[in-house]
């Protein structure tokens, strides 16, 4: 599973939960297509993948700066951009989780 598909699944679950909280309607078909993996496991897996991408980018960068002739500049730049995009995506997921949590906490019982 790549970072994008994991985050898509998380966002689909968040949207379905938000729809349920807002309208009290039945879960959408999106929820049933999401794998039966635990939400916490999906989130942990996505965070681990982002961490791996960042570590790889950092390692390539260190090797390039250290003078390793096998590491090309374009490989370093691509790796750094992948790490940046995956980290920014994770930040957006975190922001949506916080917003969803705040909405749930503000609901009247």
From Swiss-Prot:
Q: Which organism is it from?
A: Nitrosomonas europaea (strain ATCC 19718 / CIP 103999 / KCTC 2705 / NBRC 14298)
Q: Where in the cell is it found?
A: Bacterial flagellum basal body
| Molecular function GO terms recorded | cytoskeletal motor activity; structural molecule activity
Name the record gives this protein: Flagellar hook-basal body complex protein FliE
Gene Ontology terms describing biological process: bacterial-type flagellum-dependent cell motility
GO CC annotations, alphabetized: bacterial-type flagellum basal body
Task: Work out whether the entry's keyword set contains Magnesium.
Answer: no
Q: Which family, according to UniProt?
A: Belongs to the FliE family.
Residues of the signal sequence? Answer: none
Q: Which keywords does this Swiss-Prot/TrEMBL entry list? A: Bacterial flagellum
Q: Note the SS bond partners.
A: none
């Amino acid at each position: 599973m790549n970072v994008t598909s994991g985050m898509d699944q998380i966002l689909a679950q968040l949207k379905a939960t938000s729809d349920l909280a807002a309208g009290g309607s039945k879960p959408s078909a999106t929820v049933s297509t999401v794998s039966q993996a635990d939400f916490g496991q999906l989130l942990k897996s996505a965070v681990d993948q982002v961490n791996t991408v960042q570590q790889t980018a950092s390692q390539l960068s260190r090797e390039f700066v250290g003078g390793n002739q096998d590491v090309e500049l374009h490989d370093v730049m691509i790796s750094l951009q992948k790490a940046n995009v995956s980290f920014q995506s994770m930040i957006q997921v975190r922001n949506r989780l916080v917003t969803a949590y705040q909405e749930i906490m503000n609901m009247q019982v």
